[in-house]
């Protein structure tokens, strides 16, 4: 995947002189063109993957994952005024970095879209203070709130021995949804990117302008040069991380297995 050792071998095989000598030759066979892969499977993959992932998996493209992590994000497309709907579920993506503590407030829409309607960013804070602020904002709809935290919050211990998850439950936020262990960061990123724009061009994630930290995070988080590791030196990734927990939990990118068949 990406510019790996296999890409180096493929590049050697494209050398005309080595081809002339009969020493090396390489080809690209595009899965999407195969007569043995059903068209319906290709179309389903387009809807379930972001453009770069689809190009890599189905178009035999060596995709460079450097640059912006959330590359489909575009203010002109994804940012617009959004109205909180008291009749819909309230999802809170929660990152437990102490400075800042970052929460993203989301509402899944009946048409399949996901709206980020607000955010909460508290500096030099703690989990109890986050709960208090969420209580202040959403006490009327507390029964509709589901917390989607960083899974590490189940294990980080506080003074009385309770975890971050315990604190949420003690404060009355009883619906807490998280996996037992961290999913790979790449899977979480791919889930967000697919919601921003699928390979078929569909956008399902929109963000209200008041979510300034989230917008900044989606625009500016980059990969470390030459790797698929996020550059966290700027400390701006936390809101995007908070967004990623509910998105990956409820809209995960499926690991597709090409079964074949005929068109």
Can you annotate each of these PLM segments?
Residues 1-48:
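ASCE P-loop NTPase helicase motor core
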Residues 15-16, 107-110:
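Short loop/turn segments immediately following beta-strands, especially the blade-tip
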Residues 25-27, 92, 148:
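Hydrophobic/aromatic beta-strand patches that form the interior of the parallel beta-sheet core
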Residues 29, 58, 103, 147, ...:
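A residue-level signal for conserved active-site and pocket-lining positions in enzyme catalytic cores
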Residues 34-94, 99, 113:
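ATPase catalytic-site recognition across NTP-hydrolyzing enzymes
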Residues 101-107:
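Short beta-strand scaffold segments in enzyme catalytic cores
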Residues 111-230, 251-263:
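Mg2+-dependent endonuclease catalytic cores in nucleic-acid-processing enzymes, primarily RNase H-like
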Residues 233-254, 262:
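Acidic, Mg2+-coordinating catalytic module of metal-dependent nucleases/exonucleases
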